[in-house]
Amino acid sequence: MQALIQISDKQYLVKTGDKLFIPHQNAEVGNVIDLKPLAQIDQEKTSIEPSGNVQLKVLEHLKDEKVIVFKKKRRKRYQKRNGHRQLMTQVEVLSM
């Protein structure tokens, strides 16, 4: 069984035991987050308005890989380099 969940305007197709990285959530490590799924998918049928919740356990908070932003104006001797690391949360799907 799989479930389609939405977190911070992003959708994820998950099943029990999956580990995934989601945008930073304000929850402590070890806490459980309950989400209502958008859809549940079995082998034979798909339920668009399912009952029940998906439980996610917060494993850790970390930063994503660095993204380099480089600006340059030709012939003006102007160039600027900036880096950014997005905060992420790693979660594990406990149950559906």
UniProtKB/Swiss-Prot annotation:
Keywords: Ribonucleoprotein, Ribosomal protein, RNA-binding, rRNA-binding. GO terms for molecular function: rRNA binding; structural constituent of ribosome. InterPro entries: bL21-like, bL21-like_sf, Ribosomal_bL21, Ribosomal_bL21_CS. Belongs to the bacterial ribosomal protein bL21 family. Pfam families: Ribosomal_L21p (PF00829). The lineage of its organism: Bacteria, Pseudomonadati, Chlorobiota, Chlorobiia, Chlorobiales. This is Large ribosomal subunit protein bL21. One of its GO terms (biological process) is translation.
